[in-house]
Amino acid sequence: MAMKSVSNFAIFLILFLVTSEISEIEAKDKECLKGYIDAPLSYCMARIYPSLCYRNCRFYKGAKGGKCDGLKCFCDFCSDKPF
């Protein structure tokens, strides 16, 4: 009986630690990525490297980079990786 309660405690502890780390990662992404509101669709439609989203976020918004999610452009203020 004692072994079962220790196992249950260990499982709940692991789940708690995993969920707290995931929320911390999501919060960091929200701080880093800001939507480029006035970006035309062509910023993410053109298949060039690095994308127009990446280039214009760096030039006009002062970001380190930019990423496309579908046809939406997001300026990345934490990372300069073009993907």
UniProtKB/Swiss-Prot annotation:
SUPFAM superfamilies in UniProt: Scorpion toxin-like
Protein name as it appears in the record: Defensin-like protein 194
Signal sequence coordinates: 1-27
Disulfide bond residue pairs: 32-78, 44-68, 53-73, 57-75
One BP annotation, GO: defense response to fungus
SMART domains registered for this protein in UniProt: Knot1
Subcellular location: Secreted
Protein's gene: ATTI3
Site (Reactive bond): 47-48
Native organism taxonomy: Eukaryota, Viridiplantae, Streptophyta, Embryophyta, Tracheophyta
Any one Gene Ontology cellular component term annotated for this protein: extracellular region
Family, similarity comment: Belongs to the DEFL family. Protease inhibitor I18 (RTI/MTI-2) subfamily.
GO molecular function: sodium channel inhibitor activity
